[in-house]
């Protein structure tokens, strides 16, 4: 057999086409040739041709009812598309791989494939990356594997922060908190809730930060935590217009143990005019004082 990958591809293509003398496609033989051709192309750095060979090898494995091997080939094709900066194919190929893993009943690799796509697209297509991270989380949630999604929640929140969509980032930390609660991962849960509160404060939304704190305080584990005490001190300092106290809490060890992206934002607090916040609070009190 020729070791020329181009000739292998040509021969394999013929084996998949029906003719007057070939009444059924030889997908097994063709797939072996596509796989060998892909290796040959990769060895000679012909990544575009290797990618095409892997796509066809994946199709061949599908035709042989082998979705696991088909998924592996799609992931390899996606990695080559990334090397070639063909971003729409990166997303499409990893999504296809994920679907094939789901077909195998394998939630973890299905989620991992979407996570790989999201990481590849974070800088070039951040909105697509967010959707991929979201879908990756949902696959694990539906399979009852919430604890395996923690890093995905954080990664998605990080993309939102880069886009300065702080409220959306907070929402993902709250989702992380809910997932952590299901797994009895109390430390992760409390850190997630404090992170969400800091994000609301960074976005100048004291009212939402307070609502978030009050909602999270319904959970006993959070109410008794160091993270809850830090959140309470921050909110009190905001309401009192105490800039020094805000900076002190934001640089304390409890905040320093949060994710790096949250620490960076906390160090910049307060971002708004806290004296204006204090004046608004006092005005509200005056309006309520009818004596």
Swiss-Prot record:
SUPFAM superfamilies: TPR-like. GO terms for biological process: intracellular protein transport; vesicle-mediated transport. Pfam families: SNAP. Its main location: membrane. GO terms for cellular component: cytosol; membrane. It is a peripheral membrane protein. The keyword Amino-acid biosynthesis does not apply. It is found in: Membrane. CDD domains: SNAP (cd15832). Keywords: ER-Golgi transport, Membrane, Protein transport, Transport. Required for vesicular transport between the endoplasmic reticulum and the Golgi apparatus. Binds to SNARE complex and then recruits NSF to disassemble it. This is Gamma-soluble NSF attachment protein. It comes from Arabidopsis thaliana.
């Amino acid at each position: 057999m020729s070791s020329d990958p181009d000739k292998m591809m040509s021969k394999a293509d013929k084996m998949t086409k029906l003719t007057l003398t070939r009444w059924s496609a030889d997908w097994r033989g063709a797939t072996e040739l596509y796989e060998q051709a892909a290796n040959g192309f990769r060895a000679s750095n012909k990544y575009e041709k290797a990618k095409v060979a892997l796509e066809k090898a994946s199709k061949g494995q599908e035709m042989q009812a082998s979705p696991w091997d088909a998924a592996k080939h799609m992931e390899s094709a996606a990695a080559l598309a990334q090397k070639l900066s063909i971003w729409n194919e990166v997303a499409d190929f990893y999504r296809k791989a994920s679907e094939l893993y789901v077909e195998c009943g394998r939630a973890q690799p299905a989620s991992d494939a979407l996570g790989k796509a999201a990481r590849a697209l974070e800088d070039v297509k951040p909105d697509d990356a967010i959707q991929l991270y979201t879908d990756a989380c949902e696959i694990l949630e539906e399979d009852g594997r919430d604890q395996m999604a923690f890093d995905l929640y954080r990664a998605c929140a990080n993309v939102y922060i880069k886009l300065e969509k702080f409220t959306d980032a907070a929402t993902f930390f709250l989702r992380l908190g809910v997932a952590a609660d299901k797994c009895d991962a109390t430390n992760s849960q409390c850190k997630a809730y404090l992170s969400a509160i800091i994000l609301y404060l960074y976005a100048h939304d004291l009212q939402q930060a307070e609502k978030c704190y009050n909602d999270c305080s319904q959970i006993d584990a959070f109410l008794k935590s160091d993270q809850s005490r830090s959140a309470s001190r921050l909110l009190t300092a905001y309401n009192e217009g105490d800039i020094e106290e805000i900076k002190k809490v934001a640089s304390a060890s409890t905040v320093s143990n949060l994710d790096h992206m949250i620490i960076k934002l906390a160090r910049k607090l307060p971002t708004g005019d806290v004296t204006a916040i204090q004046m608004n609070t006092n005005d509200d009190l005056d309006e309520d004082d009818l004596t």
